Amino acid sequence: EKQKARFSYGLTERQFRRLYEEANRRQGVTGENMLRFLELRLDNVVYRAGMAATRAQARQLVNHGHVDVNGSRVDIPSYRCKKGEVVSLRAKARKMVVVQWNIDVLDRQSPAWLEMGDNGHEVTVRELPVRDQIDIPVREQLIVELYSK
């Protein structure tokens, strides 16, 4: 289960372990916190918004500086988005053929916790995702049990 989640989000073992440790420190259910942190990563938000075809492509868009958060360039894929933040593509990225294709052809529905705007070039984090809104087929309790040994 851990490997399934880790590969789905494209994280190294160290990144995943750190995420678990922070989720464990926070109040609430550790497994849900962990999935929420995974979903709120900037590369995942770009993917969920339909700006990229895959999480790897979303990670590359972020790494290459094509993404703004609240008007400022952010090139760290692990950046954790907060409620109310606006994630948008920079002007140069909006003209890229691959980005246009992703938005037009894939036409992916964004989850309920994201609000689309500006022809798919912008997305607002409306609320923090809850477990029901996260569609990754992972049993997070097994991950928590593995790491809590």
Where does each model-flagged region fall?
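Ferredoxin-like alpha/beta domains used as RNA- or RNAP-binding modules
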Residues: E1-A49, I76-K149
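Short, well-ordered loop/turn sites that connect or cap secondary structure elements
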Residues: R55, L61-V62, C81
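Glycine- and Gly-Pro-enriched alpha-helical subdomains that act as flexible
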Residues: G65-V69, R73-D75
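Short, intrinsically disordered, mixed-charge
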Residues: M51, N63-H64
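DNA major-groove recognition helix of helix-turn-helix
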Residues: V62, R73, A91
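A contiguous catalytic/ligand-binding core that recognizes phosphate-bearing ligands
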Residues: A49-R55
